Amino acid sequence: MIGTSVLAAFLFILAVSPDPVHAQRAGENAVAEADDAFGTVIGNEEIGLYSSTNARGFSPSQAGNLRINGLFFDQAAAPNVRVRRGATIHVGISAQGYPLPAPTGVVDFKLRVPGDRYITSILASEGALFSYARHNAEVDTQVPIVKGVLSIGAGLGYKRNTAHQFAVSDEGYSAGLIANWTPNDTVSVIPFYSYSKTSAVGGDRPRIFLGDNDPPDFRAEDITSPDWLFFGFRQHNYGFVSEVALPDGWMLKAGLFRSVNNTPRSFTAFVLGVDALGEGDYAISQSPPSYTRSTSGEIRLTRSFVEGVRKHTIYLNTRARDRGRAFGGGDLQHFGKVILGAFPELTEPQFQTTAPSESTTRQVTGGIAYEGVWQGVGQWSMALQRTSYKRTQARVGWAPIEGRKSPWLYNAAAAVFLTRDLAAYASYTRGIEELGSAPGNAVNRDEAVPAELTLQVDAGLRYQITPDLSLVAGLFQIDKPYYAIDQDLLFRQLGTVRHQGVELSLAGSVTDSLTLVAGAVFLQPRIAETSNGGARTELTAVGPIPRLIRVNIQYRPAAVQGLALDAKVESVSSRYADVSNSRRLAGAITLDAGVRYTRTISDVPVRFRLQGRNLTNIRSFTPNASTQIRPFEARRFELSVAADF
């Protein structure tokens, strides 16, 4: 019913669109738009050191540090590209623009706000990966209903075999509606709705968990499963953001969001204790329907005062969320030994699932913040918050378990211009963040742990080499409780973890023809474990990469207007494959390259793009603390065409 309504609205908007004129999807270019190398998403393009799932070795998404147009958003599922134009990861000096930052960094989703021009964009891509053909088709349109007052946008998307790392075959659909209403000069409202459906149509690939040995050599295509081994989810995001200019210079910003991730009855396969030859114990779990649902939002009042060359801004802020989850209740069955690449054909057995457990989290945070800017001298900020956090967990047959916390949270930051082009910055942040849930091989699988206090200190320099090229060099330290699987396979707190590191960014236009986005992070993720009778053991955490370098280059030869050559080099250092730090994976360097050509055909901007990824077909793995390993994606190619009518 919801999908039909979105389709009907989309077709109506498309039908009333006259001839068009302005580029939208054809002009998307993450390298050209990135301000630094710490993470930028534009449309389907993503570059930089960090992402919504990894910043300084932690996950901002898991921690709960997401924003939509700058306002707090508690994610059950991410808004899709029908309503989301992109995202920016803010750490270091770029995070100082937020009145209430977070220790793990902030990820700010930017909505695809419809404007005052008629535009219909079409994007189609075709990819090749071993025996797979990967398909993607997207249509987006925007229509001004009342010019300068109301514009509406809508989009539809279809993809096939784009989640090949997780499914033997998969398909997905996306739809979205968004509006931009500005009834007068003082009020703006942007409501939106996005829907995504993704499912495995050829079997969910088993998760591979390593034994006490080196990993075997395998690719994702070696991990197969029967067709009935299904997974899927249905995701909804809707809400609005609004700005209202109030009397006496006050500004009100507000956002209210509903995020839903529904998972029907599904299966998950595991190969446990895999040895160096690729043999392990094959197990499959069936889970009853589950969900994650959250209502969240933020109200912010802002008032600025100008005093000559100094500007003072006060923020009064309230954030809240109401989050519910249903999880667990699965039945795990074992099917003996299996060798990767030689999975048996199994008929679906009878599973005995039980009612899932449920948890609710309610949190309200109020705060006050101050920011000062002294032109030519620097800026400084500070904030104080008090949060009320309540989490209730209910298991079938057990009394509910309730936990409460009401800590004070605070942060302070400053940046000083040492010269016209050189600035030094520093900050201290105390926050409360979510730490994730138990992995699939834990006895308390999918159980979320309570939010905990976390700390971050960082400092660094920003140098404006030219007006179009900047360098950032920073130091950081983040402290959190450490949760992992113990010897009884129970996911619980085992100690503390500290990430200390150096991060570098060089981004911008080197010449009129050459753009560079280069970043490096040198990370020391250390665990202080106190689980063995009080004895303290210090180890290196598994998962975070000790040295990561990513360099994106884009060259636009002056001789061919509209042509751009792209290249990306990524270097990952050697890293531990097990929590005992007894085995290491070798470092790896991968190379991506591509070409894009943009021109206007009959007044229609059109972009052609050819990409090749992992061109040298490097074989390696990404490990995590639960002993799961995931192979690098194999060499693959993709051709795409985007046009704005």
Q: Which residue ranges define each predicted feature?
A:
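A beta-strand signature from Gram-negative outer-membrane beta-barrel systems
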Residues: 36-37, 57, 63, 67-69, ...
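Transmembrane beta-barrel wall of Gram-negative outer-membrane proteins
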Residues: 128-203, 229-248
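Flexible loop and strand-edge segments within Gram-negative outer membrane beta-barrel domains
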Residues: 186-188, 192-236, 263-265, 271, ...
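Face-selective signature of the C-terminal outer-membrane beta-barrel domain
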Residues: 188, 234-262, 281-396, 417
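Surface-exposed extracellular loop regions of Gram-negative outer-membrane beta-barrel proteins
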Residues: 199-212, 322-331, 390, 414-458, ...
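Membrane-embedded beta-barrel scaffold of Gram-negative outer-membrane proteins
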Residues: 243-245, 251-257, 261-269, 417-425, ...
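Conserved C-terminal beta-signal and adjacent last beta-strands/turns
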Residues: 314, 541-645
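Gram-negative outer-membrane beta-barrel transporters
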Residues: 376-379, 477-479, 493-578
